[in-house]
From Swiss-Prot:
The active site is at R72, Y76, Y98. The gene is cmiMA. Residues 254-370 are annotated as: Clasp domain. It is an enzyme of class 2 (transferase). The modification N-methylphenylalanine is found at F381, F383. Within the homodimer, the clasp domain wraps around the adjacent subunit to position the core peptide into the other subunit's active site for iterative intermolecular methylation. Homodimer. GO terms for molecular function: methyltransferase activity. It comes from Coprinellus micaceus (Glistening ink-cap mushroom). GO terms for biological process: methylation. CmiMA automethylates at Leu-379, Phe-381, Thr-382, Phe-383, Ile-384 and Ile-385 before being processed by a prolyloligopeptidase which likely forms a peptidyl ester upon removal of the follower propeptide, which then undergoes macrocyclization with the N-terminus of the modified core peptide. Peptide backbone alpha-N-methylations change the physicochemical properties of amide bonds to provide structural constraints and other favorable characteristics including biological membrane permeability to peptides. The modification N-methylisoleucine is found at I384, I385. Pathway: Secondary metabolite biosynthesis. Residues 371-376 are annotated as: Precursor leader. This is Methyltransferase/ribosomally synthesized type I borosin cyclic peptide precursor cmiMA.
Length: 389
């Protein structure tokens, strides 16, 4: 359950610092950091650490809880408890964790679950993960053929299924089978790496390609995206390039044939086999007859009747900006929505009504010409990959 009893004063907010130094921190995360009583963080670089301390001097580094004589699980338990102790003291605690704070991060989920079970307000704000960076740098859309993400050791230990027809992303390929912690792992300690290659070769064959990917931490770096065959990854000079922050991307086997549900297609009224457009379909061309026709029509396009532009002036815009970026303002709003709206100047009656109601349809509609609630379908920007037409 996301909602929790507000009877207890302490609260916990978990945010992500992203991958790239400082620049991946969201406005929402920065606002949470600035307004916290105390910030507990585990981040990947000194620049982000200094930025957090600049935004909130009452910040503590949890990285010191790691130890080379400790199991990582014990460290994660301690990290969670370090934050929970302060929540129980009635403090507004913010935990900042590298990447997305809920993706391959154990202490955040533990702390949130315990805080909620004890009646404290607790939530997680999203951040950018290594996988998000991988999708951007390698030009991959996971929806094109589906995508499965595994932690490398988990894949092996639990015999997770591999679907060669979909994208596969593997985390922590540089520490296969490792449960301990070291401040400086070397590639020759990744002694179980060949077990991972054996599993991949079983599913894809030795000549299938794998992209070794490392997202850049600083703006001075470029992403690392090196393509090797599974067989090449067994070579010592290649294996030595695999680090603790390495991620593998395994593309689908192009030889895998698509299986259509013809009964379902018939029920949808589709009489032909769906196609996948360029660039997801390597056999498609970027400028075929259909694409050329669509581009020709672009010159004479006019906004359709259902399109509603943003109002040129709206007092509601400034109010929503404050509510998004200032937690104390949001607290005032939640205490009494009607009183909050009545105390504002420059809003129309429709905008006040939308603010009190607070749902996305009414608010989105109040910002657009016409003031009427927005159809939920218009709020979803769906870029469909599979062509059914």
């Amino acid at each position: 359950m996301i909602g929790a009893s507000l009877a207890k004063k302490g609260q916990l907010t978990i945010v992500g610092s992203g991958i790239a130094s400082i620049s991946h921190l969201t406005l929402q995360a920065v606002s949470a950091i600035e307004n916290a009583d105390i910030v507990c963080y585990v981040v990947a670089d000194g620049a982000t650490e200094a930025f957090i301390r600049k935004k909130n001097p009452n910040s503590l580094d949890l990285y010191h809880l790691y130890g080379e004589d400790k199991q990582r699980t014990d460290t994660y338990i301690q990290m969670a408890e370090f934050m929970l102790i302060r929540v129980r003291q009635g403090q507004n605690v913010v935990g900042v964790f590298y990447g997305h704070p809920g993706v391959f991060v154990c202490p955040t989920h533990r702390a949130l679950y315990i805080a909620r079970s004890e009646g404290y307000k607790a939530r997680m704000l999203p951040g950018l993960s290594a996988e998000d960076c991988l999708f951007a740098d390698l030009g991959i859309d996971p929806s094109s053929v589906g995508c499965v993400t595994y932690e490398a050791t988990d894949l092996l230990v639990f015999k997770r299924p591999i679907n060669p027809a979909s994208h596969l992303v593997l985390y922590q390929v540089g520490i296969v089978g490792k449960s301990n912690f070291k401040f400086d792992y070397t590639s020759d300690e990744n002694i179980h790496f060949t077990k991972l290659l054996d599993r991949l070769e079983e599913a894809y064959g030795p000549e299938h390609s794998v992209t070794h990917y490392i997202a850049p931490l600083f703006p001075t770096e470029d992403p690392i995206a090196e393509e090797y065959t599974i067989a090449q990854l067994r070579l010592p000079e290649i294996r030595d390039k695999i680090h603790t922050i390495s991620t593998f991307y395994v593309p689908p086997k192009t030889s895998e044939s698509l299986i259509y549900d013809e009964v379902l297609l018939a029920s949808l009224g589709v009489t032909h086999k769906p196609s996948v457009p360029y660039p997801w379909n390597p056999e498609a061309t970027p400028y075929g007859p259909r694409e050329k026709k669509a581009i020709e029509l672009l010159a004479e396009h006019e906004p359709p009747k259902g399109y509603r532009p943003l109002k040129e002036r709206s007092g509601l815009l400034a109010v929503l900006e404050k509510l998004c970026l200032e937690p104390l303002e949001m607290k005032k709003y939640n205490e009494d929505r009607q009183a909050y709206a009545d105390g504002l100047k420059g809003l129309t009656e429709n905008e006040k009504e939308a603010l009190v109601k607070g749902d996305h349809r009414t608010l989105a509609g109040a910002l657009k010409v016409g003031d009427t609630p927005t159809n939920p379908a218009a709020l979803v920007f769906t870029f469909i990959i599979t062509r059914l037409d």
